[in-house]
Regions:
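Gly/Ser-rich helix-loop-strand patches that form or flank binding pockets
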Residues: 83-134, 196-241
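A conditional alpha-helix N-cap/helix-loop micro-motif detector
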Residues: 17, 58, 83, 124, ...
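Short, aromatic/basic amphipathic alpha-helical patches
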Residues: 25, 50-57, 61-68, 156-170, ...
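A short, acidic, amphipathic alpha-helical segment used as a generic capping/interface helix at domain edges
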Residues: 165-166, 184-196
Protein backbone atom coordinates (compact mmCIF):
# COMPACT_ATOMS: atom_id res chain seq x y z
CA UNK A 1 0.00 0.00 0.00
CA UNK A 2 1.59 3.26 -1.10
CA UNK A 3 1.32 6.41 0.96
CA UNK A 4 -2.02 8.21 0.72
CA UNK A 5 -2.12 11.43 -1.25
CA UNK A 6 -0.83 14.29 0.88
CA UNK A 7 -3.04 17.39 0.96
CA UNK A 8 -1.25 20.56 -0.12
CA UNK A 9 -2.66 24.08 -0.03
CA UNK A 10 -1.69 26.27 -2.99
CA UNK A 11 -2.64 29.91 -2.33
CA UNK A 12 -2.71 32.22 -5.36
CA UNK A 13 -3.61 35.89 -5.45
CA UNK A 14 -5.46 35.34 -8.72
CA UNK A 15 -6.66 38.87 -9.31
CA UNK A 16 -3.17 40.26 -8.70
CA UNK A 17 -2.12 38.30 -11.75
CA UNK A 18 -0.54 35.46 -9.76
CA UNK A 19 -0.71 32.28 -11.80
CA UNK A 20 0.30 28.67 -11.36
CA UNK A 21 4.08 28.67 -11.82
CA UNK A 22 5.74 26.52 -14.42
CA UNK A 23 6.26 22.96 -13.13
CA UNK A 24 3.82 23.18 -10.20
CA UNK A 25 1.44 20.65 -11.74
CA UNK A 26 4.25 18.09 -12.14
CA UNK A 27 5.52 18.75 -8.61
CA UNK A 28 2.05 18.09 -7.16
CA UNK A 29 0.97 15.31 -9.53
CA UNK A 30 0.54 12.86 -6.62
CA UNK A 31 -1.10 15.31 -4.22
CA UNK A 32 -4.57 16.26 -3.21
CA UNK A 33 -4.42 19.97 -3.98
CA UNK A 34 -6.57 22.61 -2.33
CA UNK A 35 -6.24 25.45 -4.82
CA UNK A 36 -7.06 28.67 -3.01
CA UNK A 37 -7.73 31.71 -5.12
CA UNK A 38 -7.84 34.70 -2.79
CA UNK A 39 -8.16 38.42 -3.15
CA UNK A 40 -7.50 40.89 -0.35
CA UNK A 41 -10.11 43.64 -0.29
CA UNK A 42 -10.20 46.93 1.63
CA UNK A 43 -11.80 46.92 5.10
CA UNK A 44 -14.78 48.95 3.91
CA UNK A 45 -15.65 46.64 1.00
CA UNK A 46 -18.12 43.86 1.70
CA UNK A 47 -16.92 40.43 0.59
CA UNK A 48 -20.26 39.77 -1.18
CA UNK A 49 -19.82 42.94 -3.19
CA UNK A 50 -16.29 41.96 -4.23
CA UNK A 51 -17.45 38.48 -5.17
CA UNK A 52 -20.19 39.91 -7.37
CA UNK A 53 -17.75 42.24 -9.06
CA UNK A 54 -14.73 39.95 -9.52
CA UNK A 55 -15.95 36.43 -8.77
CA UNK A 56 -16.44 35.30 -12.32
CA UNK A 57 -13.05 36.51 -13.58
CA UNK A 58 -11.26 34.97 -10.61
CA UNK A 59 -13.11 31.67 -10.87
CA UNK A 60 -12.38 31.23 -14.56
CA UNK A 61 -8.65 31.70 -13.88
CA UNK A 62 -8.82 29.32 -10.97
CA UNK A 63 -10.55 26.68 -13.07
CA UNK A 64 -7.89 26.97 -15.75
CA UNK A 65 -5.16 26.33 -13.12
CA UNK A 66 -7.18 23.49 -11.58
CA UNK A 67 -7.46 21.83 -15.00
CA UNK A 68 -3.66 21.96 -15.43
CA UNK A 69 -3.14 20.36 -11.99
CA UNK A 70 -5.71 17.65 -12.70
CA UNK A 71 -4.23 16.90 -16.12
CA UNK A 72 -0.89 16.14 -14.43
CA UNK A 73 -2.61 13.72 -12.05
CA UNK A 74 -3.57 15.67 -8.93
CA UNK A 75 -6.93 15.52 -7.17
CA UNK A 76 -8.02 19.15 -7.02
CA UNK A 77 -10.48 21.14 -5.00
CA UNK A 78 -10.86 24.88 -5.65
CA UNK A 79 -11.81 27.57 -3.17
CA UNK A 80 -12.27 31.25 -3.96
CA UNK A 81 -12.11 33.65 -1.02
CA UNK A 82 -12.44 37.41 -0.84
CA UNK A 83 -10.90 38.45 2.43
CA UNK A 84 -9.75 41.37 4.53
CA UNK A 85 -6.92 39.31 5.97
CA UNK A 86 -4.89 36.90 3.89
CA UNK A 87 -3.00 35.18 6.74
CA UNK A 88 -6.17 34.29 8.65
CA UNK A 89 -7.78 32.92 5.49
CA UNK A 90 -4.79 30.72 4.66
CA UNK A 91 -4.67 29.47 8.22
CA UNK A 92 -8.38 28.66 8.27
CA UNK A 93 -8.13 26.68 5.03
CA UNK A 94 -5.12 24.71 6.25
CA UNK A 95 -7.24 23.73 9.21
CA UNK A 96 -10.51 23.07 7.34
CA UNK A 97 -8.86 20.83 4.76
CA UNK A 98 -6.33 19.29 7.13
CA UNK A 99 -3.46 20.32 4.84
CA UNK A 100 -0.14 18.63 5.40
CA UNK A 101 1.76 21.44 3.70
CA UNK A 102 1.43 24.82 2.05
CA UNK A 103 3.21 25.50 -1.22
CA UNK A 104 5.03 28.78 -1.70
CA UNK A 105 4.63 28.72 -5.45
CA UNK A 106 7.77 29.44 -7.44
CA UNK A 107 8.55 27.87 -10.76
CA UNK A 108 10.40 24.58 -11.10
CA UNK A 109 10.81 23.59 -14.74
CA UNK A 110 11.61 20.10 -13.48
CA UNK A 111 12.16 18.57 -10.10
CA UNK A 112 15.05 16.11 -10.00
CA UNK A 113 16.29 16.86 -6.50
CA UNK A 114 14.62 17.98 -3.29
CA UNK A 115 16.22 19.42 -0.17
CA UNK A 116 14.37 18.36 2.97
CA UNK A 117 15.50 20.66 5.79
CA UNK A 118 14.82 19.11 9.19
CA UNK A 119 15.44 20.91 12.46
CA UNK A 120 13.98 18.87 15.31
CA UNK A 121 12.01 15.71 15.83
CA UNK A 122 8.62 17.44 16.07
CA UNK A 123 6.30 16.44 13.27
CA UNK A 124 8.90 14.36 11.42
CA UNK A 125 6.22 11.85 10.44
CA UNK A 126 4.40 14.64 8.65
CA UNK A 127 7.54 15.51 6.68
CA UNK A 128 8.13 11.92 5.62
CA UNK A 129 4.47 11.47 4.69
CA UNK A 130 4.66 14.48 2.41
CA UNK A 131 7.99 13.57 0.80
CA UNK A 132 7.04 9.93 0.22
CA UNK A 133 3.54 10.85 -0.92
CA UNK A 134 4.80 13.30 -3.53
CA UNK A 135 8.03 11.68 -4.63
CA UNK A 136 7.97 7.91 -3.99
CA UNK A 137 7.18 7.14 -7.63
CA UNK A 138 8.93 10.12 -9.14
CA UNK A 139 12.58 9.06 -9.20
CA UNK A 140 13.57 12.26 -7.39
CA UNK A 141 16.83 12.49 -5.41
CA UNK A 142 16.14 13.46 -1.79
CA UNK A 143 18.70 15.18 0.44
CA UNK A 144 17.86 15.13 4.15
CA UNK A 145 19.55 18.14 5.67
CA UNK A 146 20.01 18.99 9.34
CA UNK A 147 21.72 21.99 10.89
CA UNK A 148 23.05 20.93 14.29
CA UNK A 149 21.60 22.73 17.29
CA UNK A 150 23.25 23.88 20.49
CA UNK A 151 25.15 21.08 22.21
CA UNK A 152 24.39 18.56 19.49
CA UNK A 153 27.17 16.37 18.09
CA UNK A 154 27.47 15.49 14.38
CA UNK A 155 26.71 11.88 15.43
CA UNK A 156 23.42 13.00 17.00
CA UNK A 157 22.49 14.68 13.72
CA UNK A 158 23.46 11.64 11.66
CA UNK A 159 21.48 9.25 13.83
CA UNK A 160 18.46 11.59 13.70
CA UNK A 161 18.62 11.68 9.88
CA UNK A 162 19.23 7.92 9.78
CA UNK A 163 15.86 7.42 11.45
CA UNK A 164 14.16 9.74 8.98
CA UNK A 165 15.81 7.89 6.12
CA UNK A 166 14.52 4.51 7.37
CA UNK A 167 11.02 5.96 7.60
CA UNK A 168 11.21 7.18 3.98
CA UNK A 169 12.49 3.81 2.77
CA UNK A 170 9.62 2.14 4.59
CA UNK A 171 7.26 4.53 2.81
CA UNK A 172 8.54 3.52 -0.60
CA UNK A 173 11.51 5.74 -1.47
CA UNK A 174 14.52 3.80 -2.76
CA UNK A 175 17.39 4.09 -0.28
CA UNK A 176 19.92 4.88 -3.01
CA UNK A 177 17.96 8.04 -3.78
CA UNK A 178 18.36 9.43 -0.25
CA UNK A 179 21.40 11.35 0.92
CA UNK A 180 21.93 12.73 4.41
CA UNK A 181 23.86 15.85 5.31
CA UNK A 182 24.57 17.37 8.73
CA UNK A 183 26.13 20.81 9.07
CA UNK A 184 27.01 23.14 11.88
CA UNK A 185 25.89 26.74 11.46
CA UNK A 186 24.98 29.74 13.60
CA UNK A 187 22.61 30.91 10.90
CA UNK A 188 20.44 27.91 9.97
CA UNK A 189 18.26 29.84 7.53
CA UNK A 190 21.27 31.11 5.60
CA UNK A 191 22.65 27.59 5.57
CA UNK A 192 19.36 26.21 4.24
CA UNK A 193 19.13 28.95 1.60
CA UNK A 194 22.71 28.25 0.48
CA UNK A 195 22.08 24.51 0.24
CA UNK A 196 18.79 25.07 -1.55
CA UNK A 197 20.56 26.62 -4.51
CA UNK A 198 21.71 23.22 -5.73
CA UNK A 199 18.19 21.72 -5.53
CA UNK A 200 14.94 22.18 -7.44
CA UNK A 201 12.54 22.32 -4.49
CA UNK A 202 12.68 22.63 -0.71
CA UNK A 203 10.60 20.94 1.98
CA UNK A 204 10.81 22.50 5.42
CA UNK A 205 8.74 22.46 8.60
CA UNK A 206 6.96 25.38 10.20
CA UNK A 207 7.94 24.20 13.69
CA UNK A 208 10.81 26.66 13.64
CA UNK A 209 9.22 30.11 13.99
CA UNK A 210 11.91 31.71 11.87
CA UNK A 211 10.91 29.45 9.00
CA UNK A 212 7.42 30.89 8.86
CA UNK A 213 8.80 34.40 8.79
CA UNK A 214 11.26 33.22 6.16
CA UNK A 215 8.41 32.07 4.00
CA UNK A 216 5.51 34.39 4.72
CA UNK A 217 7.08 37.24 6.67
CA UNK A 218 9.48 38.40 4.02
CA UNK A 219 8.33 39.86 0.76
CA UNK A 220 8.34 37.02 -1.72
CA UNK A 221 10.94 38.86 -3.81
CA UNK A 222 13.39 38.29 -1.00
CA UNK A 223 12.68 34.57 -0.92
CA UNK A 224 12.90 34.49 -4.68
CA UNK A 225 16.34 36.08 -4.39
CA UNK A 226 17.35 33.47 -1.83
CA UNK A 227 15.71 30.47 -3.43
CA UNK A 228 14.08 30.48 -6.83
CA UNK A 229 12.22 27.19 -6.59
CA UNK A 230 9.06 26.08 -4.84
CA UNK A 231 9.03 25.68 -1.05
CA UNK A 232 6.69 23.20 0.64
CA UNK A 233 6.09 24.26 4.24
CA UNK A 234 4.99 21.29 6.31
CA UNK A 235 2.36 22.35 8.84
CA UNK A 236 2.47 21.20 12.42
CA UNK A 237 -0.28 18.90 13.61
CA UNK A 238 -3.27 20.84 14.88
CA UNK A 239 -4.57 20.03 18.34
CA UNK A 240 -7.64 17.82 18.07
CA UNK A 241 -10.72 19.88 18.77
Amino acid sequence: LGPGRPTVLVPLAVLEGESLPNGTAELLANARVVLLGYHVIPEQTATEQAREQFGETAMSKLEEFAAALAAAGADVETRLVFTHDEATTIDRLIYEHDCLAVLVPNSAPQVDSVLVALRGTVGIGRNTRLVAGLFADAGVAVTLYHVSGEGESPEDGESFLGGVRSDLVERGIASDRIETLVEDSDAPLDAIADRAESHDAVVMGETDPSVTTFVFGMPSEQIAERFLGPVLVVQRARPEE
